[in-house]
Amino acid sequence: MSKKLVLFCDFDGTITEKDNIVAIVRKFAPPEWEALTEQILSQKISVQEGVGKLFQLLPSSLRQDIIDFIVHEATIRPGFAEFVSYCREEGIELLITSGGIDFFLEPILAPFDLADVPIYCNGSDFSGERITITWPNACDEHCTNGCGMCKTTIIRRYDPATHFRIVIGDSITDLAGAKIADYVIARSFLADKAEELQLPHSTFATFHDVIRILQQVQQEVV
């Protein structure tokens, strides 16, 4: 029986060339951000705890300054628009699964035709003195990682008996999802981990590469 392809595509460092949260805190946060980031990357604290604390360093009054900065700063990885079109033409289900925050993610993606693409990310609350992150897609009972935006929770909604589940990503926040996916399209840290853990994977530099990989996968799976 053929399976339906479903893609879980990361945002920071995958759709965009660089990690936008790091760019934002480097620009706007006091020096404490570096120690917090190191604790997240070394897994001493959860992503949810760390990202929440990072944004608590930032006054809510900076909202528009941050948006203006990151929309100008963010570079979309080549081939993304073509990748979205390819998924649409081929009937491949695409979800954007991001540990990023709605208030900067949505303006960056605004130029693209994503009306039919579900976007899962963290929320934001500017009603207090400092930015508070909200977690509408937190971990389910099967995950204890404190992901914030739990990619494995979303992946588990798709039955592997009927769906071929592909994670596209680059970093530590994609690793748990990659471990339960059927296939991984990876770069940077995630590519090294996929190799180390012997996960079925291909590597990519642009979304043109991703399209080529999907064409190969389709021949084998669909």
Curated annotation (Swiss-Prot):
EC numbers for this chain: 3.1.3.87
Lineage: superkingdom: Bacteria
Reaction equation(s) it catalyzes: 2-hydroxy-5-methylsulfanyl-3-oxopent-1-enyl phosphate + H2O = 1,2-dihydroxy-5-(methylsulfanyl)pent-1-en-3-one + phosphate
Pfam family, one: HAD
GO biological process terms held by the UniProt record: L-methionine salvage from methylthioadenosine
Keyword Hydrolase assigned: yes
HAMAP family with a match to the protein in the record: Salvage_MtnX (MF_01680)
Role summary: Dephosphorylates 2-hydroxy-3-keto-5-methylthiopentenyl-1-phosphate (HK-MTPenyl-1-P) yielding 1,2-dihydroxy-3-keto-5-methylthiopentene (DHK-MTPene).
Entry-linked PANTHER family: PHOSPHORIC MONOESTER HYDROLASE (PTHR28181:SF2), UPF0655 PROTEIN YCR015C (PTHR28181)
Protein name per Swiss-Prot or TrEMBL: 2-hydroxy-3-keto-5-methylthiopentenyl-1-phosphate phosphatase
Organism listed in the record: Brevibacillus brevis (strain 47 / JCM 6285 / NBRC 100599)
Gene assigned in the entry: mtnX
